[in-house]
């Protein structure tokens, strides 16, 4: 079995403490001769860790198929110092493969006692927003402009490894170790894509607000910078991200909308006036001019300038923004589009923006 260690310094653009205790995080990646542990072999495991000042990359590679168990045992022992595994698609492939492989040797893997962070799962909700062609590791690396020396895919290296087991070529060994090393070394810089996900909880500051006849344009300062400028839409709003600056354009609706009372059984509908009143007041109205309200007729009208709520927001009669309870209005009872009254105060605008940003990670 080949054991190789490399210590190096490199910046990490994303705060590691957001994943866990930095010194207890273990990035890992495996290389195999196929997708099924029962029909293929594990030949390489790489692990990357950070001690607070520098990175350490460790790799264990089987020089022959019979050394698979040695590789497994070495990695299992190494995991003892860590409590969180960080990987790309490891929940679906790497971890199940290692467990199945270990079972063939009656080995117990420590994964059930460790936290697991699958970066693919974290990034998947961002695919459309970032206009990613697919969610392959190299596609995300290209989006972030992360360079590679390695030009092979894992599948292409299967035949390289099989040739290596027969010839023990240094050149082939280098190709195999390089691919795994770059998969791992590129994970810390790849973490920066999580800043887009973190926008859903990001503290932001409204810098300016410009109202036109039918739009509201808001400029904001973010608590962090995103790695790449991008434009996207969320519901009816347009977003432009540039470093730590966010510009958003919302449509404005001016006119009359209905507010539907949630406890409609407490109301009577007045057909001539086209609105509902509470039963305590309705008792003084001629019974010929009132009807028991239904969910569709228990409403009152409000006129003003309104902002849309994010699409898919559950239909409610009220919501709370910046500590204030605000009525939710619609054109019709069955309308999917919901609105709230526009307020120019900064606290309202910042809370309103968060409503939209929270939909990014869904």
Predicted regions and their residues:
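DEDD superfamily 3′-5′ metal-dependent exonuclease/proofreading module
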Residues: 1-28, 33-40, 50-362
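Short beta-strand scaffold segments in enzyme catalytic cores
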Residues: 45-47
């Amino acid at each position: 079995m080949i054991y190789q260690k490399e210590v190096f310094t490199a910046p990490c653009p994303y705060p590691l403490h957001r994943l866990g205790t930095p010194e207890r995080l273990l990035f890992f990646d495996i290389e195999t001769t196929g997708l099924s542990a029962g029909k293929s072999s594990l030949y390489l495991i790489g692990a990357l860790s950070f001690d607070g000042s520098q990175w350490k990359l460790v790799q264990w590679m089987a020089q022959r198929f019979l050394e698979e168990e040695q590789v497994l045992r070495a990695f299992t022992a190494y995991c003892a110092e860590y409590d969180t595994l960080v990987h790309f698609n490891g929940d679906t492939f790497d971890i199940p493969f290692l467990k199945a492989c270990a079972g063939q040797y009656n080995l117990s893997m420590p994964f059930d006692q460790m936290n697991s962070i699958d970066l693919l799962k974290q990034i998947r909700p961002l695919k459309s927003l970032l206009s990613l062609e697919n969610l392959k590791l190299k596609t995300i690396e290209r989006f972030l402009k992360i360079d590679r020396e390695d030009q092979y895919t894992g599948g292409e290296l299967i035949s390289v490894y099989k040739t290596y087991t027969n010839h023990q070529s240094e050149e082939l060994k280098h190709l195999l170790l390089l691919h795994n090393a770059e998969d791992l070394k590129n994970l810390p810089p790849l973490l920066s894509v999580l800043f887009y996900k973190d926008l859903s909880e990001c503290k932001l500051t409204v810098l300016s607000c410009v109202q036109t006849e039918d739009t509201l344009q808001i400029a904001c300062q973010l608590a962090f910078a995103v790695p790449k400028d991008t434009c996207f839409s969320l519901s009816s709003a347009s977003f432009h991200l540039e470093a730590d600056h966010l510009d958003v354009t919302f449509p404005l609706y001016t006119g009359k909308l209905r507010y539907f009372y949630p406890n409609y059984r407490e109301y009577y509908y007045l057909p001539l006036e086209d609105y509902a009143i509470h039963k305590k007041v309705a008792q003084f109205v001629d019974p010929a001019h009132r009807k028991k309200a239904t969910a569709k007729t228990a409403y009152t009208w409000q006129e003003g300038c309104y902002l849309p709520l994010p699409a898919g927001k559950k239909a409610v009669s009220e919501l709370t923004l910046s500590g204030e309870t605000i009525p939710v209005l619609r054109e019709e009872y069955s309308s999917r589009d919901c609105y709230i009254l526009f307020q120019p105060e900064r606290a309202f605008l910042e809370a309103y923006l968060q409503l939209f940003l929270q939909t990014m990670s869904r």
